[in-house]
Each structure stands twice: as C-alpha cells, then as structure tokens.
Amino acid sequence: MRDTLAIVGGGPAGMMAAIRAAEVLGNGRRVVLFDKNDRLGRKIYLTGKGRCNLTNRRSWEEFAPHIHPNQGFLKHAFRAFSNEDVIRFFEEELGVPTVTQQGQRVYPASLVAGDVARALERRVQELGVDVRRGVTVSSLAELADFGAVIIATGGKSYPVTGSTGDGYRFAEEAGHTVTSVFPSETALLPKDYDPGLPGLEMKNVGLHLYIDRALVESEQGDFNFTNDGLESGIAYRLSRRAVWALYNGQRVDIVLDLKPALTEEQLINRLQRAPQLWFSSRSQKNARGSKNHPLATPVFNRHSEPSDTRHTGLDPASLRSFLPEVLVAPFLRANPDLTVENLPQRLKSWPFRIIDYKGFERAVVTAGGVSLKEIVPKTMASRLRPGLYFCGEVLDLDGDTGGYNLQIAFSTGSLAGISAAKYLL
C-alpha cells in the first residue's frame, strides 16, 4: 500500500483532494477515501441555508480581506485553483450550472446544496476512488501502511455531521501545534434580550463591534434576530472577533445603526421639516407654543406603554416613518427616556451588551486549528512529517460568510490532492 494515498474526511476538501489525486495518479484505486458518515459531503447539505454558497467571485484583492487569520497563506492555493476555476469545474466538469447573486456570491443555479454534494461524490466514484463510508479512523497509526495521508476532517462545527475535531488529534499525534479553536459565524446573545426581537429580519443596517469599549470593526448589510441572539449575515462577520474576545474575558458590545445611510444631522433635519409627524393631533396646538418645539418632547417614558400618548403628546405610531412596525415596541422598551431630541442619536446607536454565544453545535465555522507555520503553503504538506498533508477547516484558516470557506476547502483540497499524488509518483 506504499503507493496508495489515504484521505481522512469526505467533505468538500476531502472530495476535492480525492478527485485531484485520482486524476494525477491516473488510477482511482490508489486513492482511499475514509468517511465516518454513510454519505459523503454531509455538511455541504447545510451550507448557505441549504443552497450552498460555492464561492465568491471577488478578485483576490477583494477576496483576501475576508480570510483569517493569515490571508497570505491561502494565496498560492487560490492562484492554483481560484474562484473562477471552481465555477468552471462545477459547470464544465460536473455539469452543475451556477448563478451569481448579491455580494458576488455563487450558488448552484438550482439553489439546492444537495446537487453540489452529489456531483462531487459522483465524480469521485467515476474516477474509481476506493470510498469507505461509515469507517472511523481513530489514529494516524492505523494509516501507517499508506504512502501518503491527507487530513481533511473539518473542524468542530456542526458535530452532528461528523465534524468532531478528530483531525486535531491526528495533527498532535504527528507533533503539530493546534491553536485554540472556537466557534465562528455563530449567534451572539445580548444581555436582557427583548422577547419581541426574535424573528425579526434586519435589512440594510449597520453593526459596530466594540471590545472593551473600543470600536474594532463595523459592517453594513442584513442580519436576523433569532431565539439565540444576533445571527446570520453581518452578525456572523463580527462573531469571530466577538467570540474570541468573550473567550478571553473581554467586554463585548454591538451597536446597531438602524439608519446607516443617514447622519444624525440628516435625521434631525427630517424631524424639523415634518414636526407634525411627531405629535398627536390633540397636542399639536400646545406643542407649537412651546419654546422647545420641535426637539424636546418625550415620546415615551417608563410609566407608559408604547401606544400610550397621554403622557407625551406624541403618537408612537409616527415612529413607523423611521422603523418597521414590528420594531417600534422593542425600540421604545430599549429607550424609555426617548425624546424627539435624542431620537436621531438612538436610531444610530442601539447598544447590545453581548454576554454569550452559541457553541460548535450551531456554529457554521470553526476558527483556529493546525498551525499554518507548520504547513507548506505551496503544497499543503506538513513541515514535520513527510507524506502528511492537511486541507480545509482543520487548518487554522477560515473565512467570512459569503462563499469564502468553501473556496478555502476547494483550493486547499485541490492543492493537497495534487501534491500528495506527486509525492507518490
């Protein structure tokens, strides 16, 4: 078996490695693919909310900032098998047409993740790869008879798919360093989470991440309030740094900007141009006579319900001019001292103290992993043990939401497969 390659893990990186290795060797039987599940690519079925965001079409210069913690490590693998190469591979070799959507995200045209997983598995079988499903590899020692080994076991996210961190143990067995691993692209739970928020979808808003009260990152786009907290979209992009900060005992705050396209001054001007929106009809006459009109009238206080105008003279329904109706009540509860004067600032700055996060059982991605210092970026080979290779999420390499993580899997998997096969020749 010294002329045979073992690949542990049948996810996107492992299948890509198997395909490339079989092509180089010209004999799929010299490639043995082990997977503990009864079907390959199980995690692919969950990606992109079941639609499978294959990659992102941004140029390397725009793509690279979305890779963590060392974008330079990926550069050679990306150049060797780029996002455009991935698209051509699926369309021309696997017969899976693709579509590019908002944010340069690429999906199968069917928007069915299973089409991607099945196409990869079909190609693996066509090449004659020896696929051993339902087989758990417990240690590297079990693979001692193989001439080369690729570890493509994934991380620890979504353990129900078989990603239980086995690859870290294999790496340590070979003398490799494994950096701290933690959940990324996961839900962030605020303190005193308002029960009216779960289920709301936020569109075109801003989120600002503060660690120990210092602004460290900002994003603009969409996210969801769920039962678990702030989730999906731009919340996921902030979660990597937020989780790491919580992991290290730091204070984490996220500030929501409901009107990122407008400055506070522009919001103030809007109010001044249409003061009638902010007072109930019965109080407009008195309000006009106030020397502080129109920017000093409370809109809500601790003793009134959101729909109660008896104390304020202002109809909270007017907030619908600035907020979706379903968000009005939670916004007012979060701002019991709201006035027309401070309304612009509150619309631009709704703070959430983050106290917890969902773990690996819900995280989309694992951050951390096998130290990149011990991997050759041009081959994915171990610097410590000849014939040993790593690819995919098991590495200390991850990306933002938007197709970046699957591109990492495909690029590093392709390079590892080619390199390991050449090692055997």
Question: Which residues are covered by each model-predicted region?
Answer:
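Glycine-rich FAD pyrophosphate-binding loop
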Residues: 6, 22-49
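Glycine-rich loop(s) and the adjacent beta-strand/alpha-helix scaffold that form part
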Residues: 148-194
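An anion/pyrophosphate-binding glycine-rich loop and adjacent beta-alpha core
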Residues: 38-40, 45-46, 60, 177-180, ...
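Beta1/beta-strand and adjacent pyrophosphate-binding region of the FAD-binding site
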Residues: 1-13
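A conserved FAD-binding loop/helix module that cradles the flavin
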Residues: 157-174, 397-425
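Conserved N-terminal/central alpha/beta ligand/cofactor-binding core
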Residues: 36-130, 135
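A conserved short coil-to-beta-strand element within the FAD-binding core of flavoproteins
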Residues: 133-143
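A glycine-rich dinucleotide-binding beta-alpha-beta segment and adjacent secondary-structure elements
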Residues: 133, 326-398
